[in-house]
C-alpha cells in the first residue's frame, strides 16, 4: 500500500497546472450513453474514478479509447448491456449516474446500490423518486436498483426535497431523451451541473436554467455528440491555494476558472491572502500566518463542503478561533482526530468544529479517511515541525492527479513510499 512522507517547512512557490474536474467529468462521461454517435472528451483527468467509469462503460458495451493522456473517445452507439455490476459500483458512488442515461436510452437499467467515500448516507431515493415521476417502474432487488420503462420516459415536474448534485445530474440526463418537458425545481446549482448541461446541449439537448434552482429540459428523440472539453477542477484549485496560504507561499494556478471559486477566494482573502485573477488563472500570495475564518458549508454558490477539511487545516494554524460548520454531510469531521494527533486544538459539537489556532504542528503517522480529508492531512504535513506519514492515500488518488508531483514542482518535500 502507498503512503506519503511529507517533510514540512518549505513555502510553495511557482506555477501549477490544474487538471480537469473529476466531479464534472464523471457525469459527462456517463452522458455518452445518451449519444448515438461517438463523442471525444478532452481535459479528462486519468484518476481512479475516471478509469473505473471507463471500465464500467466498456462493460455496458461502449467502445472507449484514450487518444492521448487527457482525451478520451467513447462510442456508445451499440451498447447492449443494462446492468452496472456491484464489483465496479461498490468502489465509486458516482456509478449511480448510469441509471438515468441507461433507462432513457434503453428503457431498462439495473444498477447496484453504490459505494464510495464513507462520509454519510447520501441517499439515492431522490433519483428513484424523480424517475418514477417520469413514468419509470423501479424496484430494489438483491441490492440492485431495477428500473424499466416501455417507450420513452415522460416529462414531469420534479421537486427535489433536498439539493442533490448527482440527483440533479441523473434526472437532467434522463429528461434529455424524455417525451415532453421536465422541470426540476430546487435543482443543484454547482458549476459541474452547468458543465454537464453545456455538454448535453452540445449533443442536441434543449436545456435552460442551468446554474439556477430551476432546470427546464425539453426532451428530444436522440442526441448526437461530437467533442466536449471538461471544466477545470475548482476543488483541486482550492486545495493548492490553501496549501500555498498555509505555507505562506506564492503560487499561480493555471487552466482554472476563478468564477467557480468565489466563496473560497473570498474566505482566503479574509484570512489575509493577496489574490489576483485572470480569465483562466488565480495567483495567491501569503506573507504572514492566516487569520482565523469561520466557515459554513452549504450548496453552491455558498462555501463548498469539498473545501471544508482544507480550511480546517488552515484554521488550525491561524491566529484566533474559528468555527467550521458542516451542513451537507454527516461524518465529515473524520480528519479531526488525525489533526489532533499532530497537535491541533479542535473541539467538536455535533456538526460544528471549534478550532483554536496553535503556533505549530508536529509530524505524526496519520490516516486518510476520505478524499478531501487526505488532502487536509498532506497540507498539515507541509508545515509540520517533523516528518509526517499519511497512510491510505488511495483516497487522495481518487480525486487528485499526481498531487505529489505537482507539490514537488512547487518546492514541497513529499514522496510516495510503499508501506506494509
Curated annotation (Swiss-Prot):
Example GO biological process term? Answer: cell division
Signal peptide from the UniProt entry: none
The subcellular location is: Cytoplasm
Entry coiled-coil feature ranges: none
Positions of phosphoenolpyruvate binding:
22-23
- Keyword Cell cycle found: yes
Catalysed reaction equations from the record: phosphoenolpyruvate + UDP-N-acetyl-alpha-D-glucosamine = UDP-N-acetyl-3-O-(1-carboxyvinyl)-alpha-D-glucosamine + phosphate
The 2-(S-cysteinyl)pyruvic acid O-phosphothioketal modification is found at: 117
InterPro entries in UniProt: Enolpyruvate_Tfrase_dom (IPR001986), Enolpyruvate_Tfrase_sf (IPR036968), MurA_subfamily (IPR050068), RNA3'P_cycl/enolpyr_Trfase_a/b (IPR013792), UDP_GlcNAc_COvinyl_MurA (IPR005750)
Q: Which GO terms describe its molecular function?
A: UDP-N-acetylglucosamine 1-carboxyvinyltransferase activity
Q: Which GO terms describe its cellular component?
A: cytoplasm
Asked if the keyword Nucleotide-binding belongs to this entry, the reply reads no
Give the metabolic or biological pathway: Cell wall biogenesis; peptidoglycan biosynthesis
Q: What class of enzyme is it?
A: transferase
Question: Active site at which residues?
Answer: 117
Entry keywords, A to Z: Cell cycle, Cell division, Cell shape, Cell wall biogenesis/degradation, Cytoplasm, Peptidoglycan synthesis, Pyruvate, Transferase
- Any Pfam family the entry gives: EPSP_synthase
**EC number(s) in its UniProt entry?**
2.5.1.7
- Principal localization reads cytoplasm
As for family, the record states: Belongs to the EPSP synthase family. MurA subfamily.
Q: Kindly give the NCBIfam families that the UniProt entry links to this protein.
A: murA (TIGR01072), PRK09369.1 (NF006873)
Q: What does this protein do?
A: Cell wall formation. Adds enolpyruvyl to UDP-N-acetylglucosamine.
HAMAP family linked: MurA (MF_00111)
Q: What is this protein called?
A: UDP-N-acetylglucosamine 1-carboxyvinyltransferase
Q: What organism is the protein native to?
A: Colwellia psychrerythraea (strain 34H / ATCC BAA-681)
Tell me the name of the encoding gene. murA
Amino acid at each position: 500500500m502507498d503512503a506519503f512522507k511529507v517533510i514540512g517547512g518549505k513555502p510553495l512557490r511557482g506555477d501549477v497546472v490544474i487538471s480537469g474536474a473529476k466531479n464534472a467529468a464523471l457525469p459527462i462521461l456517463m452522458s455518452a450513453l445518451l449519444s448515438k454517435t461517438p463523442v471525444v472528451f478532452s481535459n479528462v483527468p486519468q484518476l481512479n474514478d475516471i478509469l473505473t467509469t471507463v471500465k464500467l462503460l466498456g462493460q455496458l458495451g461502449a467502445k472507449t479509447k484514450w487518444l492521448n493522456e487527457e482525451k478520451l473517445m467513447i462510442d456508445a452507439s451499440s451498447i447492449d448491456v443494462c446492468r452496472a455490476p456491484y464489483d465496479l459500483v461498490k468502489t465509486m458512488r458516482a456509478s449511480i449516474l448510469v441509471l438515468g442515461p441507461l433507462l432513457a436510452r434503453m428503457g431498462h437499467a439495473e444498477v447496484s446500490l453504490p459505494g464510495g467515500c464513507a462520509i454519510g448516507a447520501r441517499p439515492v431515493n431522490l433519483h428513484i423518486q424523480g424517475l418514477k415521476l417520469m413514468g419509470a417502474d423501479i424496484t430494489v432487488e438483491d441490492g440492485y436498483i431495477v428500473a424499466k420503462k416501455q417507450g420513452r420516459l415522460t416529462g414531469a415536474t420534479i421537486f427535489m426535497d433536498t439539493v442533490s448534485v448527482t440527483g440533479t445530474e441523473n434526472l437532467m440526463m434522463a429528461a434529455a431523451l424524455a417525451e415532453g418537458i421536465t422541470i426540476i425545481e430546487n435543482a443543484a446549482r454547482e458549476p459541474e451541473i452547468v458543465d454537464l448541461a453545456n455538454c448535453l446541449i452540445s449533443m442536441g439537448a434543449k436545456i435552460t436554467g442551468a446554474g439556477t434552482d430551476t432546470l427546464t429540459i425539453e426532451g428530444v428523440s436522440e442526441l448526437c455528440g461530437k467533442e466536449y472539453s471538461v471544466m477545470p477542477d475548482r476543488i483541486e484549485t482550492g486545495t493548492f491555494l490553501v496549501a500555498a496560504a498555509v505555507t505562506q507561499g506564492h503560487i499561480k494556478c493555471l487552466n482554472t476558472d476563478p468564477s467557480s471559486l468565489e466563496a473560497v477566494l473570498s474566505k482566503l482573502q479574509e484570512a489575509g491572502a493577496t489574490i489576483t485573477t485572470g480569465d483562466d488563472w488565480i495567483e495567491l500570495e501569503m506573507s504572514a500566518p492566516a487569520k482565523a475564518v469561520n466557515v459554513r458549508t452549504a450548496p453552491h454558490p455558498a462555501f463548498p463542503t469539498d473545501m471544508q477539511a482544507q480550511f480546517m487545516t488552515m484554521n488550525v494554524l491561524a491566529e484566533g478561533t474559528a468555527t467550521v460548520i458542516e451542513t451537507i454531510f454527516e461524518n465529515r469531521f473524520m480528519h479531526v482526530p488525525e489533526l489532533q494527533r499532530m497537535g491541533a486544538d479542535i473541539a467538536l459539537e455535533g456538526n460544528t468544529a471549534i478550532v483554536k489556532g496553535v503556533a505549530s504542528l508536529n509530524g505524526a503517522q496519520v490516516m486518510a479517511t476520505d478524499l478531501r480529508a487526505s488532502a487536509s492531512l498532506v497540507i498539515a504535513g507541509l508545515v509540520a515541525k517533523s516528518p509526517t506519514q499519511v497512510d491510505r492515500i488511495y483516497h487522495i488518488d481518487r480525486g487528485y492527479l499526481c498531487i505529489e508531483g505537482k507539490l514537488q514542482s512547487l518546492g514541497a518535500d513529499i514522496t510516495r513510499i510503499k508501506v506494509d
